[in-house]
Structures are given as C-alpha cells and as structure tokens.
A protein has these predicted regions:
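Phosphate-handling catalytic cores of nucleic-acid transaction enzymes
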Residues: 1-486
Length: 486
C-alpha cells in the first residue's frame, strides 16, 4: 500500500524502495487464509473498485476509438483516391499524420494482485497496467513449484527497483522502469522443506530468499479455546482503513504522474543507523551469527531501512517528515527477531552456536561443579578433552567468546586460564544486561533463554526465600512422631 508513496534514503544518500517481501511458514489449520483475508481484503477492495472504474473508462475508450477509426478510414480513402487520380496528396497525408497522433490510448488496468504467474506475464502486467504490484499466495508452494520462480532475477530486480529489459519473441520487447513489487507468500513447513531440498542452494545463491522477511509463528491448531473466527476489532478496522487510504494515495500519485517522496532519517536516527549497520557487519565475520548466512546478513540492513520507512509512512499522516530514531529502532528489533526465523528454518543452526552448545556440554562433563548451577573450568583442560572441533584454538576461542558475550561465562579473577560457567544469569551479571541476549539473535539451547531484569530479580528473590525457608525449618531427625504408640 505504501510502496509508491516514497523511497528511503540511507545516511549516505543511497535510495531504496519501501517494497517488502514476506514468507510466512505455517502448517495446515493455522488459519493462513483468515490472515490473508483480514489483511489483504482492503487491497482487493480497492482493486475491485478501481476495476469498476476501468470498465467505464474502457467503454469510453472503445467509443472514441470507433470514432477515430471512422475518421481515419475516410482520410485514408481520400488519400487512395488522390493517389489513383494523380492529384496532390500533401494536405491529406498531413491530415492522416495528425489523426495518427491523436489516436486514443487504452486506459491502464488497475490490476494490483498477481497470483501464480510467469515472470514475463508479471513484468508485462506491471508494464501495461499499473507499475505497482503485489505477488500474493496463501499456498506458497504453488509459487515456488510453479512458473513464477522460473526467473528469480526478475523478481530480485523488481524488489531492488531496477529497470528491467524484457525480450519477447512474439511481441515487442520493452523496458520496465521504476516499478514496485511487494510479495506475501504463505507455505507449509513440509512444502518448504521440499523446496529447500530441490532449489534451496540456488534460491539462496541468487539472493532470492535473502530479500524475504521469514516468519514462522508457533502453531496454535489444537490449542484454541473457540472454533469460531474472531470478528475484526476496532484496531483491525482502523488498520484496514489505513491500508485503503495509503493504497489509494499511491495510485493517485501514479495517475497524476507525481514523483515518489524521498524519506530521510533524523540526525539521531542517522547515527543509530550507522551503529546498527556496524553491528551487523561484525556479525558477518567468521565468529558471527551471519557468517554462514551472508546472503541474509548483507540484505538485513536494507530490510530494516525499508521497514522503518513503511512504519513511518503508515503511522504518520504527515509522512513527509523524517524517520525517527524510535521508528528505526523498532524496525531493527522486529527484523532481528525474525532474522532468527530465517536462520533456524532456511539456513540451519550457525556453526558458532553449534560449537557453543558443545562447549557447554564439555564444561559440564570436565569442569568442577560449584553449587547448583556453576562450573569452574580450565580452558586447556576443555581443549584437551572436548570434541575434535573444540581442540582447534580458533573454534574454542570463538565459542568461548560467544558464551562470555551472553554473560554466562566469566573469567576468574585469580587466573587467566580459569573460567566459570553460570547457568543462572543473575549469578553471573546481576542487574547488568549482557551484550548478547540468549534466544534473541543467537539461541544456545544448552543455556536458559534470556529473561528481562525484572523477571531475573523476581526469580532471585524466590530462590532466597526458598533457601531461608529451608534453613528456618526444624530438622525432622529425632522427631517423636505423631503420638502413635505412646
């Protein structure tokens, strides 16, 4: 709805579209169709409304075209007669040329939604109709296994906003310029696994998957309290009305020939953008979470930028103002959350996380247990006795570094080679926040998921109360019993 209102400028001036592509992974019975209906029906309604206007314009076009053909035919007859009779034809030829210049042009069709279609048909539709499209499927398998992905380069270029040359054998070739395409594909996990086996490497190598925001919501089938569909609430109605409004504005901008606005960031947001981009670049290094998902990591900051633009366009009536720091931070948190979904379900567990899990298991085996959830260990001992991969210095250092960044491992104050693993994060960092929150960007399954400070404090108080209760309880040794036999 927003993709033709504005583009977004990086702090360095590079401009990108606001178009987004989402891949939603959900099993049968997870109400993919209901989600599609709630959030895409406003687009369908605007499309139907505009296509109703198209019929009237098409009728007017056919009427004017018929009149034009009649007039041109008469001039053509006159030209043939003059030629046959040897009379001068300059005036008639000029009149014929003028008629050709005023030939009625067919109105553009307001098709917005494209389902299972070939890349050529998609490009042709965006060229002949509105250069504004939405590739949609509530069963993404038909798209991935059908004709739409015969040429992922075209869809990649549309996402990037590049000009596209389409060469056709039967019809004239054309160049599609400045078009905008968003996509929303829903697919079942089993179908996605088949697609990954058949085409996964190719779709990642071409950067096709990397352009998508991948969402894998937890399953709800079998856990709902009601079988009926909930009616849209007031918030949903307002959301749908905003979609209609923004889409109509986008179409109106196209029909008036107006240029898209260029959204920029505020100065604080620009500084934050640079910091976030630097953080992501670090994660592309050999010990980073994106090292084995470089396709995704390289596109992540662009998707964050696009989402910040969409949020700004959607939430603000005066959307020509600058994107704020809060909007950019929200877009970052959202993208990083779903980045985990991409890694878990498209890429698989990063090697650094696998090594970190192995290191935790090795520490439990070969370290010295202290208390309920602490292990003291010496780095060289772990290196000597752990699995082969952890015997390499680089692998061990990277895995150990990741655990230290989560706050669960700290170096001993008494020896540089001695460390302590804390399974309870409160015991390790107290009220401080760790650099990396387990379960957010990385998920080390051998350690607890990060909990906010308030929850850690509450759990710590409960543990203290439980210990105090045990200390204050009288010993049952020597208890005279309940009085039986006395």
């Amino acid at each position: 709805a927003c993709q033709n209102l504005a583009d977004v400028a990086y702090p360095n001036g590079h401009v990108v579209p606001c178009s987004l592509m989402t891949l939603i992974i959900a099993g049968s019975g997870e109400r993919k169709t209901a989600v599609d209906r709630w959030f895409c029906d406003p687009i369908r309604e605007v499309e139907r409304e505009k296509m109703g206007e198209d019929k009237q314009q098409q009728w007017q076009y056919q009427k004017h075209l018929g009149i034009w053909k009649t007039k041109r035919s008469e001039i053509d007859k006159k030209l043939r007669k003059e030629t046959r009779d040897g009379e001068p034809t300059e005036v008639t030829e000029s009149a014929l040329s003028e008629m050709d210049e005023i030939k009625p042009t067919p109105p553009k069709n307001h098709q917005i939604i494209y389902n299972n279609t070939t890349p050529e048909a998609l490009a042709s539709g965006l060229y002949q109709n509105l250069p504004l499209g939405y590739l949609l499927s509530d069963e993404g398998g038909t798209v991935f296994e059908g004709r739409a992905l015969q040429d992922t380069t075209l869809i990649n270029d549309l996402w990037s906003g590049s000009d596209i040359r389409v060469n056709r054998k039967s019809n004239d070739s054309f160049i599609l310029s400045d078009a905008r395409l968003s996509a929303s594909l829903m697919i079942q996990p089993e179908v996605l696994n088949q697609v990954l086996k058949k085409k996964g490497d190719k779709l990642r190598e071409t950067g096709f998957f990397a352009r998508f925001l991948v969402v894998y919501p937890p399953p709800h089938a079998g856990y709902r309290e009601s079988l009926s569909y909930n009616k849209p609430g007031e918030d949903t109605k307002q959301f749908q009305q905003r979609i209609r409004d923004r889409l109509k504005r986008s179409i109106d901008k196209l029909e008036k020939g107006e240029q898209r606005d260029i959204l920029e960031f505020t100065k604080p947001a620009k500084r934050l953008w640079e910091d976030l981009n630097f953080m992501i670049q670090i994660e592309l290094r050999p010990d980073g979470v994106f090292y084995h998902a470089k396709d995704h990591g390289e596109k992540l900051m662009e998707n964050i930028t696009r989402i910040a633009g969409v949020i700004h366009l959607f939430e603000n009536d005066d959307y020509r103002s600058n994107i704020t720091e809060a909007e950019l931070r929200y877009a970052y948190e959202l993208c990083r959350h779903y980045s985990r979904h991409y890694i878990d379900h498209i890429v698989g567990e990063p090697r650094i996380v696998t090594l970190a899990n192995e290191l935790v298991r090795a520490i439990r085996l070969y370290g010295t247990k202290r208390g309920d959830c602490e292990y003291e260990f010496i780095k060289t001992t772990i290196k000597r006795r752990a699995i082969r991969d952890l015997r390499e210095n680089e692998n061990l250092d990277n895995a150990l570094g990741l655990l230290m960044r989560t706050g669960h491992v700290q170096q001993s104050r008494y020896s540089n080679s001695q460390y302590i693993l804390y399974e309870d994060l409160f015991e390790a960092v107290g009220n401080r926040e760790p650099e990396i929150k387990n379960g957010y960007f990385y998920h080390i399954k051998e350690l607890p998921i990060y909990e906010p400070k308030e929850k850690r404090d509450e759990k710590h108080r409960e543990q203290i109360e439980a210990r105090n209760l045990r200390k204050s309880s009288p010993s049952r040794e020597g208890d005279s019993g309940s009085g039986f036999g006395q």
